[in-house]
Every structure is written in structure tokens, then in C-alpha cells.
Amino acid sequence: MSSTTKVSSAVMQTYNRFPITATKGKGSFLWDDNGEKYLDYTSGIATCNLGHVPDNVQHAISNQLKDLWHCSNLYHIPSQEKLAALLTEYSCLDQVFFCNSGAEANEAAIKIAKKYAKDKGYDDRTEIITFEQSFHGRTGSTMAATAQEKIHQGFTPLTEGFRYLPFNNKESLSEIDNGKTSAVLLEVIQGEGGIHTAEKDWLKQLAAICKQADILLMIDEIQTGIGRTGSLFAYQPYGIEPDVITVAKGLGSGFPIGAMLAKQHIAASFSPGTHGSTFGGNPVAAAAGIATLKEILSDGFLENCKEGQEELFNQLKSIKEISPLIKDIRGKGYLMGIEVMNQASAWIEKLREKQILVLPAGEKVVRILPPLTTTKEELQICIQALKEVALELGGNTNG
């Protein structure tokens, strides 16, 4: 350590960390180093979709650790092949590139869009369109793809090749097919940007424009995928077929893994040497992904989540009706946002004092991300705490 520098932690301070030191997790709960128990409705930022340390995933990881941890992608990996087969069977895509995170998955999508355009002879198609208030990562290219000025501050000049359009704006759709666009990248529900859901007519029109012009439609499912919004992938209820999707977070139930899925004719642009990942789709990560998907795809699992998801939405609406501090309730499934009139941080702090963990989605939105395995009793604990916080912060919860 430098003799002129004194720091309290050797970890770089890239996060404004909450005053909790997590030591254990199980199901919907997290414990700190003092033994305090918290209802964790952050799910590791939409990652622990099966709750903390799910038994089946733990067993799959433990069993794989006995045989092989890592061998690189120079060799065939059976668990990787099996996971890819599952992902393609239950989506409209054909082939998978594995990596370690959401940002890496989106980087892969950006690269394949550029390569596909070159392979097709679309030399003038040098732009990828993304949308205002999007979030696609913090690497060089994914930060540039993220249409939020606060994410860009201090990192200019940004990577070139991205153009931003307003989200859910039908008038701006005419700007997509301008001869320069290789791909459109978007979230069906903008998570970090404030829980904004794509309107069905808008997204279907966008998809039709892309299909007619051979512009790649790429859906970022990092936060919305793996059952988070009620279907395996958030794009599926819209009746569209993206050319590329990206997944991570919930895919490994907290074990690091990411993936970029593409149609076969697009995947062909990634020939040997064009892209790679040392650890991507390693045997342990793939085992975690297989176990996760098997649970979520099991008979009745997603259907059984619907009652709790509807209950959460209805209860949040009822709190809004009696609290002048709540402006709107947004989201789908177990990806919900409460837009408040004051600062979201005030709600988050009050809830933490009541042993409930939630997240911000911007300055004015409280983000609630229960695990898909949460119970009715746990949901009621959260709802009751929200009612109490609304009252404490000035809401009229007496009707």
C-alpha cells in the first residue's frame, strides 16, 4: 500500500454500500454479521430468483466441483452444451455464446451486430440505437449504449456508434431505418431507468421495422429474464421474435454467468477467433444455470408465481390510493417500482430499519424485487412495512 494513502478498505469504493455486512443467506432472507435477519426483496439485484442458496443449485454446483472446475473453451464442455440446448429450446433463438456477466453479454451483442452488418455488406450501418433511460452496463461500449448522462459523467469521449431515441415514442420509430442502423438494443422493462415498460403496439411496430430492413432487434433480458416478469423472458408475451437476446443475473442463481443468444444466421458471424471468454460457460457456472432453469421451467412453477405477483401489485395500488406520497406503481411480475414524490432513499432507509431490503431505480423510484420463491406471508411482511413507512413519511394510511 502507498505510504501516503490511508483507506478504511482495500476494496475500491465503486458502490454506495448500505450499512449491512452480509454473512449468510437462505431463501428470501439475508443475515448480517450481528445476526440480524432481513427480508431481502432485492434478490441480489434481480439475481437470486430462486432465493439465496437454493438447494438444487447448491447440489448441482457441489457435484460439479468434485469433477471439473475449469478447462477453457478450447474443449467441449457437456454442461455448457446442455445449458445452451435448454436456453434455445425455450426461446426463439438458435445458438448461445457464454460469458460471465450482463455487461459482457451486451458487449457480445454489440460486437455481433457490427460483425453481422459487415458480413452482409452493410458498410454504412455503423450505428446501434438504444433508448433514453436505458441501462446496458458499465464497460466502455455498454456505458456508451446506456442513454443516461449520469452514467457517462467523467468518461468522455464515449465509444462512438450509438444513437438514442425516446422510449415508447411512436413518432421516433421513423428514425430507425435511416440507412445507418445495424441494430436496436432495448430492455422490455427499463430496470435501472425507473421501471418503465414497453408498450405492446410500440414494440411490435419497432420489431416490424427491424424485420423489414434487416436491422437486428436485440433485447436486453439481463434484469427481466429467467422468470422475473412472469414468463421465462420478458419479450415473449409481446408476440415478437428478437434476433438476439442477452441474459445473466438470474441465470445462475447468483453464480456468475452470462449469455448472448442469437438466430443461427446471425450467430454464424461469430466464427473462431472473432470473440471469446476464458471463463464463459465453465462447467460450474453451466451446472448452476441448468439447475436454475430446470426449477423455473418445472411444471407449474411460473404459474404458481402469478398469484403472489398479482397480490403484490394490487396491494401496492391500494397503498397508493391512501398515500399522497406515491405517484405511480409500475412494473410486471416481481419487478415492481413505486414512484414517490419525495426521495426513494427515504423509503429505502425506513424499510431497512424494519428489516426489509429494497432498491432504488433512480432518485424517485423504489424498486421491489422479491425472489420468485417468496411466500404469501413474506409478501405481507413487506406490504405491512410499506404501509407503516407511508404513514411515517406523511401518508394518510387511515383512508
From Swiss-Prot:
GO terms for biological process: L-arginine biosynthetic process. Its EC number is 2.6.1.11. N(2)-acetyl-L-ornithine binds at residues 138, 277. Disulfide bonds: none annotated. GO terms for cellular component: cytoplasm. InterPro entries: AcOrn/SuccOrn_fam (IPR004636), Aminotrans_3 (IPR005814), Aminotrans_3_PPA_site (IPR049704), Class-III_PLP-dep_AT (IPR050103), PyrdxlP-dep_Trfase (IPR015424), PyrdxlP-dep_Trfase_major (IPR015421), PyrdxlP-dep_Trfase_small (IPR015422). It is found in: Cytoplasm. The keyword Lyase does not apply. Pathway: Amino-acid biosynthesis; L-arginine biosynthesis; N(2)-acetyl-L-ornithine from L-glutamate: step 4/4. It catalyses: N(2)-acetyl-L-ornithine + 2-oxoglutarate = N-acetyl-L-glutamate 5-semialdehyde + L-glutamate. It comes from the Bacteria. Its cofactor is pyridoxal 5'-phosphate. May also have succinyldiaminopimelate aminotransferase activity, thus carrying out the corresponding step in lysine biosynthesis. This is Acetylornithine aminotransferase. The gene is argD.
